[in-house]
């Protein structure tokens, strides 16, 4: 009625209400500003009209936020401006490498989210841990809870009271005495689950700057294991699931990065390898 009012005003029959125009964020904004990503930086492991599975390198965040302007998904959209729909089906930590699913249709995304909640997506990781892991196969069922450091950094810990249920199956591949090479199968998908579960057994991951042994990792960076190694040794190696749209079985394998293979080769060359039974 040609005047301003507040939220307490009651409307009467015949009142004229004008709402000022609102500025809304446009999805095209990240396409214009995010740098494109070359295929050599992000190898494609599988692609059809519904799914895109890529081999994410260590150091690339899956998405923007927390001090990261653009992550993998924003850069992927910038690289494929004609794609109407690109969304992450799950996430990997910034320092974790390996297979990551991107959905190209909403139908695939919704179904894949359901499948993950139902435990119908099998996920295997390769990791190198500090110390001599002796069990051929070990189930770790320890509830996990998030907390915040005084610096504002978010972390995860085992918390029997307030934690959410979490289950990881570790399988020994090779023992090298001071470090051990393992497979980890995720039965749940909590933040930092493998890293914190491994730590809870007394075996932090090699190169883990959040939960690892800082002095040990510093020595590893300098070549104490035979070659210089300066990243988290955690790689999403294999995904196995039924295609969310076609119903066909899908198995994706992401080869270990060259730097991880080089470290394993150096460890094997020391002649201290003990294969798991």
Question: Which residues are covered by each model-predicted region?
Answer:
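A generic structural motif
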Residues: 130, 173, 185, 242-244
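RNA pseudouridine synthases
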Residues: 1-151, 164, 233, 253-275
């Amino acid at each position: 009625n040609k005047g301003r009012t507040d939220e307490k005003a009651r409307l009467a029959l015949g009142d004229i209400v004008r709402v000022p125009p609102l500025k809304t964020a446009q999805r095209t904004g990240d396409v214009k500003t995010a740098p494109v990503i070359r295929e050599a930086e992000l190898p494609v492991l599988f692609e059809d009209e519904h799914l895109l599975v890529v081999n994410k390198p260590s150091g690339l965040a899956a998405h923007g936020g927390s001090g990261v302007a653009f992550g993998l998904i924003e850069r992927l959209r910038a690289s494929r401006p004609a794609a109407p729909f690109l969304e992450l089906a799950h996430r990997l930590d910034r320092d974790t490498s390996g297979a990551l699913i991107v959905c190209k249709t909403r139908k695939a995304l919704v179904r894949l989210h359901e499948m993950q909640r139902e435990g119908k997506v099998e996920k295997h990781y390769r990791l190198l841990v500090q110390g001599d892991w002796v069990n051929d196969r070990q189930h770790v069922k320890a509830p996990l809870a998030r907390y915040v450091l005084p610096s504002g950094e978010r972390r995860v810990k085992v918390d029997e009271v307030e934690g959410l249920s979490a289950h990881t199956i570790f399988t020994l591949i090779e023992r090298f005495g001071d470090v051990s090479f393992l497979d980890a199968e995720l039965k749940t998908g909590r933040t930092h689950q493998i890293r914190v579960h491994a730590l809870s057994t007394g075996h932090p991951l090699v190169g883990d700057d959040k939960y690892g042994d800082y002095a040990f990792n510093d020595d590893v960076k300098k070549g104490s294991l035979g070659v210089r190694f300066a990243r988290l040794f955690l790689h999403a190696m294999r995904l196995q699931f039924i295609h969310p749209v076609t119903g066909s079985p899908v198995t994706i394998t992401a080869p270990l990065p060259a730097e991880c293979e080089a470290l394993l080769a150096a460890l094997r060359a020391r002649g201290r390898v003990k294969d798991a039974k």
